[in-house]
Regions:
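Glycine/proline-rich loop-helix segments at beta-alpha junctions forming the active-site rim
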Residues: 2-112, 251-374
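A polyanion-binding, active-site-adjacent surface
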Residues: 110-121, 125-309, 316-319, 327-333, ...
Length: 374
C-alpha cells in the first residue's frame, strides 16, 4: 500500500496572498492555506497556514467547493479586460509547455524525506526559511554539488541553522535573514528586481535585502542617492530617516544580492563560492514566473511570467541580466548609486517613474510600486 505521504501533494499559494499587514511579526509565513480532499483521495495543502478552507468529498464522489475557494481563485470579469489586452497572451507553445505557478505541487515533508542525512543537515536553513513559492522551483538547484559545497563552506564559517548566534559567528546577515527576500516578496508577486552585489559587512547592517538596512542603522551613502533620485522624480517624497526597504519588498520589489552572505568587515569575502550561480538561477526563475499572479487572473497566460522590470545599476548587475529577453522585460540600466559613480548616470536616470509607467501599462494601477512609501 502507498504511504499516507505519497498520497499527498502540496501547492503553496503564498503568491496570490494580498500584501501582508504592516504589523505582522515576521512577514515570513503570510500564506493562505487551502486543504482540499479530491475525488482520488489526494490532498492539497498549504502548510504555511494562516487561514484554512477545507473541501470534503460528497457521497456522489464529486468535490464540494466552498465559496471561500471560489472567492480566492475567481473574479467576476467585466465586459472586457483592459489589463488582459495590455499584457497580451503568451505564445501557444509557452502556454502548453509551462505550468502555471500555483499549479506546481510541492510537499516539503516528501522533499525532506528524499534527502540524504548529510543533505538534510546542510539544507536545514533552506527548508526552514526559503519562501515556499521559491523553494518548489529551487529544490533541485540546492541539491547540486556546487550548492552543497557552498553549504559546507558556510558551516565552516559557523552558519548551520536558523538560530545560530554563537559569539564567534562573524557572517552577515544572521542566518534567519539570508533568505528574507524570498519571504517578503513571493515569486508570483514580483514586479521589480533590483540587483545588488553582496551584503553590507558592518555589524547590524545586513538583513537580507540589497541596499536596505534595519531601522536604527545609519542610511548607507548609496541609499541616500537612491532617495535623492526618487525625490527628483516624485517631488512630494520626503526622504526617510531610516534605510529599511521592507515596504518595497512587500510591494513586489525583489531586493536581491548576487552573493547572499559575507564575512564581517571583508567585502566580497563569500563571492565565487557558489552564491552567484544560485542567484543566477533565482533570476532564471524570475524570468519564467516573476509577476505570474499580477494583473488579470482570468487571462489565458495567468500564472506564468509575462514580464517585469529590472533596475540594473552598475556593471556587475548588467552581467546578471545580460541574457534576459529585452522584449519581455523592461531592463533599465545606469551607473551605480554609489557616491563614486552616482553623478555619472545614476542621478537623473528616471528609473522609478519609467518602471511604474511600464507596469501600469502592462498590469494596470495595481502593478505599480509606491516608491515614496517606506
Amino acid at each position: 500500500m502507498a504511504s499516507d505521504n505519497s498520497a499527498k501533494r502540496v501547492v503553496y499559494l503564498e503568491d496570490i496572498e494580498v500584501k501582508p499587514s504592516k504589523g505582522s511579526a515576521t512577514k515570513e509565513n503570510a500564506s493562505v492555506a487551502v486543504t482540499e480532499e479530491t475525488t482520488d483521495g489526494s490532498t492539497v495543502v498549504d502548510t504555511d497556514a494562516s487561514t484554512t478552507v477545507t473541501e470534503k468529498k460528497t457521497t456522489t464522489g464529486a468535490t464540494k467547493r466552498q465559496k471561500a475557494i471560489t472567492d480566492m481563485f475567481t473574479k467576476k470579469s467585466s465586459s472586457s479586460s483592459s489589463s488582459s489586452s495590455r499584457s497580451g497572451p503568451l505564445p501557444k507553445k509557452a502556454r502548453s509547455d509551462t505550468p502555471s505557478l500555483n499549479s506546481i505541487p510541492f510537499s516539503l515533508k516528501e522533499y525532506q524525506d528524499s534527502l540524504s542525512e548529510e543533505e538534510k543537515t546542510l539544507l536545514t536553513l533552506e527548508c526552514e526559511t526559503l519562501g515556499k513559492s521559491w523553494l518548489k522551483l529551487l529544490k533541485d538547484e540546492i541539491k547540486k554539488p556546487y550548492f552543497l559545497t557552498l553549504k559546507r563552506f558556510l558551516a565552516g564559517e559557523g552558519v548551520k541553522g536558523l538560530n545560530d548566534s554563537a559569539p564567534n559567528l562573524k557572517v552577515y546577515p544572521a542566518p534567519k535573514n539570508i533568505y528574507s527576500w524570498s519571504n517578503m516578496t513571493p515569486l508570483g508577486r514580483v514586479k521589480v528586481v533590483i540587483i545588488g552585489q553582496d551584503p553590507y559587512h558592518g555589524p547590524g547592517q545586513a538583513h537580507g535585502l540589497c541596499f536596505s538596512v534595519p531601522q536604527g542603522v545609519a542610511i548607507p551613502p548609496s541609499l541616500r542617492n537612491i532617495y535623492a533620485e526618487i525625490k527628483a522624480e516624485y517631488p512630494s517624497f520626503e526622504p526617510s530617516k531610516h534605510g529599511n526597504l521592507t515596504t518595497w519588498a512587500e510591494n513586489g520589489v525583489l531586493l536581491l544580492n548576487t552573493s547572499l552572505t559575507v564575512r564581517a568587515h571583508e567585502a566580497a569575502s563569500h563571492s565565487k563560492r557558489g552564491w552567484e550561480e544560485f542567484t543566477a538561477k533565482v533570476v532564471d526563475v524570475v524570468d519564467r514566473y516573476g509577476g505570474a499572479n499580477l494583473g488579470d487572473k482570468s487571462s489565458s497566460d495567468a500564472g506564468r511570467g509575462r514580464g517585469i522590470v529590472f533596475l540594473v545599476w552598475g556593471a556587475h548587475a548588467a552581467k546578471v541580466v545580460a541574457k534576459l529577453d529585452k522584449k519581455k522585460h523592461l531592463i533599465l540600466t545606469s551607473a551605480h548609486p554609489s557616491p563614486l559613480s552616482a553623478n555619472r548616470g545614476f542621478m537623473g536616470n528616471g528609473h522609478f517613474k519609467k518602471a511604474n509607467d511600464w507596469l501600469e501599462e502592462k498590469y494596470g494601477p495595481d502593478g505599480c510600486v509606491d516608491w515614496t512609501k517606506l
